[in-house]
Amino acid sequence: MRIYVCVKQVPDTSGKVAVNPDGTLNRASMAAIINPDDMSAIEQALKLKDETGCQVTALTMGPPPAEGMLREIIAMGADDGVLISAREFGGSDTFATSQIISAAIHKLGLSNEDMIFCGRQAIDGDTAQVGPQIAEKLSIPQVTYGAGIKKSGDLVLVKRMLEDGYMMIEVETPCLITCIQDKAVKPRYMTLNGIMECYSKPLLVLDYEALKDEPLIELDTIGLKGSPTNIFKSFTPPQKGVGVMLQGTDKEKVEDLVDKLMQKHVI
């Protein structure tokens, strides 16, 4: 059994966000991190590896520097990594990205026992579309909002979170599960041995030439020009006013608050 974990290197949006003239993010100007929801997918895959001895393959689409992220995941416990990288793939929207990743997984092989884990959504786009689109392209069942995954005989038992609770779902393999951050799923750190060994583990690079003949990919709908989604406008919202911390006793703070509200004609 193999688990493909689809991960994405995203800009750290907690800092200043820069936008290119074409509406895409200026990723080079921002620090890169592993997408938070993807960290949960990594941890749940590694937990299953601990329990079943399965193989875990980290897979990403991105520029060559994304190799460093894959090495980090290997240092956490993944067995190997796959980097999908080509200029022709740059600027792909979710529809194009899901095609490319599906084609890569199809080329690598998806057996009847295999699974694909994705983070629910990426913080740079927040669409939550790529995971479900991969499942549709590969014609396999999918479960979203997974917060707990167990192998149960020939089935997979998934704890799917809801707004007011959760539901338990049994799904056959091969399947795709999108994972969310949950207090019960705490991503592990890289180990010292893992760091020392991660550069000796295999990392496969798939470029345009490797994937262009795959049946799941339509060459006229990939990349920035081929993507059917057009960004009409992208911008950084203006900074809001700075908050004010009131000091003193409770009585003094209440009086100060009333004064400030009266100055602004709120009361």
UniProtKB/Swiss-Prot annotation:
Keywords: Cytoplasm, Electron transport, Transport
Gene3D superfamilies xref list: HUPs (3.40.50.620)
A Pfam family of this chain: ETF
Primary localization class, coarse: cytoplasm
A GO cellular component entry from the record: cytoplasm
GO MF terms, alphabetically ordered: electron transfer activity
N-terminal signal peptide: none
Function field: Part of the ETF-acryloyl-CoA reductase complex involved in the pathway of L-alanine fermentation. The electron transfer flavoprotein (ETF) serves as a specific electron acceptor for acryloyl-CoA reductase.
Family according to the record: Belongs to the ETF beta-subunit/FixA family.
Assembly information from the UniProt record: Heterohexadecamer; tetramer of tetramers. Each tetramer is composed of 2 alpha (AcrC), a beta (AcrA) and a gamma (AcrB) subunit.
Name used for this protein in its record: Acryloyl-CoA reductase electron transfer subunit gamma
Organism of derivation: Anaerotignum propionicum (Clostridium propionicum)
Upper classification of the organism: Bacteria, Bacillati, Bacillota, Clostridia, Lachnospirales
Gene name of the record: acrB
